[in-house]
């Protein structure tokens, strides 16, 4: 569907709120990718990985904090502390044209299909806060979601993305399966000399480390 004719919340978000989730602000990052996402997009577009994948090295402590904050990505950093994300150019995702994504829905990253929903240990929550009105959201300067502002119930919010609870649960299960299979080596990623998350966790769990923290 042409972006000009699509009046879904996603198509109207940038116009109503000033920017969309595909247009990161200062210090913000686009969707986290799994190796499965990368291969699916590469196969569909023919693009080289470097054209749409950004590699963000994290310290071990940052990687541990990321997984603690986002349970859906638990295990993502088990072999490396490099986060793979969608690349932004000129303030927007490389796949954003006008108000729409050029990737077919079946090709898009699982994180994009899930947004604004965030997996938790016991279900899901919203990844963004609600301001209470579209006008307040537009003035906040913070990441917001037009669908979340317009929805009057959780069910209504799900329906605005053509989802129900079962469909959302299936997407969450898909994300967890892809995280479990991540990462597969990318040609452009070189092994880091930094500590692995697993090594940091083992070190923190050692009696010597526990004694040091008590001092």
Question: What function would you assign to each model-found segment?
Answer:
Residues 1-215:
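Short loop/turn segments that flank or connect secondary-structure elements
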